[in-house]
Swiss-Prot record:
PANTHER family: 3-METHYL-2-OXOBUTANOATE HYDROXYMETHYLTRANSFERASE. SUPFAM superfamilies: Phosphoenolpyruvate/pyruvate domain (SSF51621). It catalyses: 3-methyl-2-oxobutanoate + (6R)-5,10-methylene-5,6,7,8-tetrahydrofolate + H2O = 2-dehydropantoate + (6S)-5,6,7,8-tetrahydrofolate. Homodecamer; pentamer of dimers. Its cofactor is Mg(2+). HAMAP family: PanB. Binds 1 Mg(2+) ion per subunit. Pathway: Cofactor biosynthesis; (R)-pantothenate biosynthesis; (R)-pantoate from 3-methyl-2-oxobutanoate: step 1/2. One of its GO terms (biological process) is pantothenate biosynthetic process. GO terms for molecular function: 3-methyl-2-oxobutanoate hydroxymethyltransferase activity; magnesium ion binding. Keywords: Cytoplasm, Magnesium, Metal-binding, Pantothenate biosynthesis, Transferase. This is 3-methyl-2-oxobutanoate hydroxymethyltransferase. It comes from Stutzerimonas stutzeri (strain A1501). Belongs to the PanB family.
Length: 266
């Protein structure tokens, strides 16, 4: 697979071809995902839950993220690597710059930050220094305690309108991509149409520019036994892991996944 760049992603959005992203935490799965056609590998702080066994992403450290980013880089075969900046790793300007630099040096091509309009300053800071940023909006797991749990965001019209305005402001600040998690499908479609940058969804309907799932979820693996509504177990239809990942890629590209049953209404 030729190297995926921001230009590649922008071209896919303009053509209306869906972008496929999958979380990944090690070299072997990175190669397997690339061989299946996955275009973006996300080293998510979800590793705190699916690998480390925590009940949230909050305990994950920058050192954890750098270790797994470097592991994924070794197995990567052309996908764009996106790494999460973990909880409070961007609390100050100095921390934002230093921690983002560590993840870029470990092999990331883009840094993902969770938040709303207040992220604009951090996004400008990084973009001005040549670091692409993905802004993660909607249900942001690092704020789970503020939300009172893992709940759909943007169902009320005022909140939906604010999210739409926030998306525009983060694009204006220099965000290279947006990720929308657990928002009503109609709102995600509105945001996707309102911005020029690619929009990736998870639990955000089929009208975003691309999709992402947690690797363990789409393989039917769960420590807690809880399966989010937006997840499909691709192992049920395929005989092995490479085939399951290839099935996920095919389903996203064909706009067969997510189906209506995987989304949320306002």
């Amino acid at each position: 697979m030729p190297d995926v760049t921001l230009t590649t992603l922008q071209g896919l959005k303009q053509k209306g071809e869906k972008i496929v992203m999958l979380t990944c935490y090690d070299a072997t799965f990175a190669k397997t995902a690339c061989d299946a056609g996955v275009e973006m590998l996300l080293i998510g702080d979800s590793l705190g839950m699916v690998l480390q066994g925590h009940d949230s992403t909050l305990p994950v450290t920058v050192a954890d993220m750098a270790y797994h980013t470097a592991s994924v880089k070794r197995g990567n075969r052309g996908a764009m690597i996106v790494a999460d900046l973990p909880f409070m790793a961007n609390a100050t300007t100095e921390q934002t710059l230093n921690n983002s630099a560590l993840l870029m040096q470990a092999g990331a091509h883009m840094i993902k930050l969770e938040g709303t309009a207040w992220l604009a300053e951090s996004i400008r800071l990084l973009a001005d220094r040549g670091i692409p940023v993905c802004a993660h909006m909607g249900l942001t797991p690092q704020a789970v305690n503020l939300f009172g749990g893992y709940k759909v965001q943007g169902r009320e019209e005022a909140q939906a309108q604010q999210m739409l305005e926030d998306a525009k402001s983060l694009e204006a600040a220099g965000a290279a991509m947006l990720l929308l998690e657990c928002v009503p499908s109609e709102l995600a479609a509105r945001i996707t149409r309102a911005v020029q940058i690619p929009v990736i969804g998870i639990g955000a309907g089929s009208d975003t520019d691309g999709q992402v799932l947690v690797l363990h979820d789409m393989l039917g693996l769960s420590l807690s036994g809880r399966v989010p509504k937006f997840v499909k177990n691709f192992m049920r239809e395929h005989g092995d892991i490479p085939a399951a990942i290839a099935g996920y890629v095919k389903a996203v590209k064909a706009v067969e996944f997510p189906a209506a049953e995987h989304g949320f209404s306002a």
